[in-house]
Amino acid sequence: MPQTVILPGPAPWGFRLSGGIDFNQPLVITRITPGSKAAAANLCPGDVILAIDGFGTESMTHADAQDRIKAAAHQLCLKIDRGETHLWSPQVSEDGKAHPFKINLESEPQDGNYFEHKHNIRPKPFVIPGRSSGCSTPSGIDCGSGRSTPSSVSTVSTICPGDLKVAAKLAPNIPLEMELPGVKIVHAQFNTPMQLYSDDNIMETLQGQVSTALGETPLMSEPTASVPPESDVYRMLHDNRNEPTQPRQSGSFRVLQGMVDDGSDDRPAGTRSVRAPVTKVHGGSGGAQRMPLCDKCGSGIVGAVVKARDKYRHPECFVCADCNLNLKQKGYFFIEGELYCETHARARTKPPEGYDTVTLYPKA
């Protein structure tokens, strides 16, 4: 029904429009921003705008409607049309009269006939082909109601457990309720489209319960053989099972057994002597595994090592023999098997008279 909504200015208003005469659709509110002025005015998505500030929207385009809304500075007056909504309300009446202290919160019952099911929703009486209605049941059991009659309760001894089994097979969709002395047995076999449960097992359980309640020994039917004894497969399996089987031996074992039985040392043709591979054991005193010894102090070197002319030294032992200057990352000279810096090397190698000493460095 049409109603008028006034939004106080200024913008933004907090709603989104869609439609217009250019879209061949009415102007409809599609979105409301939470906490906005439109939400405070109780505007809802789906409201149809009939007029904006007194101007009808029948001939307005979408852009014209936006311009009308933007032109509203102090307030925006919208005339909207909102569809009716049906809300569920609880039943507060009982027998046509309102009950002040009792509220029934149960919803209205719905008819389930519009659902399509391959199987029965509600159990229906079983009808044997060739008969109009009803079913053949043992005495004292009502197939239509699924409950034993009062006369059957008084004459419990006349009920045979086998008859119950027959009745349950004739009417599988009808629950059977039997009241016996001191016990009440309810048999409700529902539809099983996938054959999840064996009908024979269910019937045997029902017959055993009734027989136990009546104080009788339950008579169970003998299980039928799944494989007929006359089949060829059945006879073949049982014939092989009855015959004693001899132990089987591998081909290599039979060859060795034949050699032992003959007692000859001659090897059969096509065989040769094969020795097992011998694993070589590496010695622990290999050259690569030996610890290098320092050329100066004579102790083993563990960690960083300095090598000069196939001689190993500790980094702290790699010094000049005269001034103990560390020669690492510097030039060094070997004179008579000793290390010297450049200064002391020049002092130890005096050239003949008339010659000067010139230092030559090896090319990298």
Swiss-Prot record:
Example GO BP: actin cytoskeleton organization
Pfam families: DUF4749, LIM, PDZ
Domain PDZ: from-to ranges: 1-84
UniProt cross-references to CDD domains, sorted A to Z: LIM_ALP, PDZ_PDLIM-like
Expression across tissues: Isoform 1 is highly expressed in differentiated skeletal muscle. Isoform 2 is heart-specific.
GO molecular function annotations of the record: actin binding; metal ion binding; muscle alpha-actinin binding; structural constituent of muscle
Domain LIM zinc-binding: start-end pairs: 292-351
Residues with PTM Phosphoserine: S18, S93, S264
InterPro entries: PDLI1-4/Zasp-like_mid, PDZ, PDZ-LIM_domain, PDZ_sf, Zasp-like_motif, Znf_LIM
Keywords from the named record: Cytoplasm, LIM domain, Metal-binding, Phosphoprotein, Zinc
UniProt subcellular location: Cytoplasm, Myofibril, Sarcomere, Z line
One GO term describing the cellular component: Z disc
UniProt key word S-adenosyl-L-methionine: no
Ranges annotated as spanning the membrane: none
Main location class: cytoplasm
Function: May play a role in the organization of actin filament arrays within muscle cells.
Subunit composition and interactions: Interacts with ACTN2. Forms a heterodimer with PDLIM4 (via LIM domain).
Protein name, entry field: PDZ and LIM domain protein 3
Organism whose genome encodes this protein: Homo sapiens
Organismal lineage: Eukaryota, Metazoa, Chordata, Craniata, Vertebrata
Gene name of the record: PDLIM3
